[in-house]
């Protein structure tokens, strides 16, 4: 199993980044809930835009993550879950640092035991469809931030910060 690219002790604190960058900080306004076993994580961004369909999420987390963070814009829908224990486990096995879901997750009790950062709006036990609709590696926007593939994302208990590095 690949080693994660970062651990909680090596992640730069989002508050420290905010102090360093100042008023121009790209800080996500959306108040996400932490579901993963890793509260602090960082990595290069990969994105998916989908709506109640998680096939692209499943496929992407099945690829080598190399310490990246998958940002999923699910249109803020909590009608179906886009990530559950099996898909998140694929992310752990493939070296992903974290997943941000602008939508819902499920299997939350198990997600808390996995060594991966997972933040989402909430939970829903209903699974999503898997038709493959959506887009990958395109800029997505929510919470006042545009998440651009290849940029750096930092996440901890205080929030989510994005910066070009």
Swiss-Prot record:
Task: Give the EC number(s) under which this enzyme is classified.
Answer: 4.1.3.17, 4.1.1.112
Q: Which SUPFAM superfamilies match?
A: RraA-like
Query: Which reaction is the catalytic activity of this chain?
Result: 4-hydroxy-4-methyl-2-oxoglutarate = 2 pyruvate; oxaloacetate + H(+) = pyruvate + CO2
Task: Tell me the cofactors it needs.
Answer: a divalent metal cation
Q: How is the cofactor bound?
A: Divalent metal cation.
Any GO BP:
regulation of RNA metabolic process
GO molecular-function terms, A-Z: 4-hydroxy-4-methyl-2-oxoglutarate aldolase activity; metal ion binding; oxaloacetate decarboxylase activity; ribonuclease inhibitor activity
What residues bind substrate, as annotated?
Answer: 84-87, 106
Q: Please report a single Pfam family linked to this protein.
A: RraA-like
Protein keywords: Lyase, Metal-binding
Q: Which InterPro entries match?
A: RraA, RraA/RraA-like, RraA/RraA-like_sf
Summarize where a divalent metal cation binds, as residue positions.
107
* The family this protein is said to belong to: Belongs to the class II aldolase/RraA-like family.
Q: What does this protein do?
A: Catalyzes the aldol cleavage of 4-hydroxy-4-methyl-2-oxoglutarate (HMG) into 2 molecules of pyruvate. Also contains a secondary oxaloacetate (OAA) decarboxylase activity due to the common pyruvate enolate transition state formed following C-C bond cleavage in the retro-aldol and decarboxylation reactions.
- Complexes and interactors: Homotrimer.
Name listed for the protein in its UniProt record: Putative 4-hydroxy-4-methyl-2-oxoglutarate aldolase
Q: What is the organism field in this record?
A: Nocardia farcinica (strain IFM 10152)
């Amino acid at each position: 199993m690949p080693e994660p690219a970062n651990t909680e002790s090596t992640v730069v604190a989002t508050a420290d980044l905010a102090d360093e960058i100042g008023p121009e900080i790209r800080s996500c306004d959306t108040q996400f809930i932490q579901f993963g076993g890793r509260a602090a994580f960082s990595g290069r961004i990969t994105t998916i835009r989908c709506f109640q369909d998680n096939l692209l999420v499943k496929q992407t987390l099945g690829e080598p993550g190399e310490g990246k963070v998958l940002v999923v814009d699910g249109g803020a829908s909590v009608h179906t879950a886009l990530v559950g224990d099996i898909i998140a486990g694929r992310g752990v096995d493939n070296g992903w640092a974290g997943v941000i879901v602008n939508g819902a997750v499920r299997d939350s009790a198990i997600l808390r035991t996995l060594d991966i950062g997972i933040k989402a709006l909430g939970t829903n036990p209903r699974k999503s469809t898997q038709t493959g609709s959506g887009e990958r590696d395109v800029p997505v926007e929510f919470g006042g931030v545009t998440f651009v593939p290849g940029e750096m994302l930092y996440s901890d208990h205080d929030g989510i910060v994005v910066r070009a590095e």
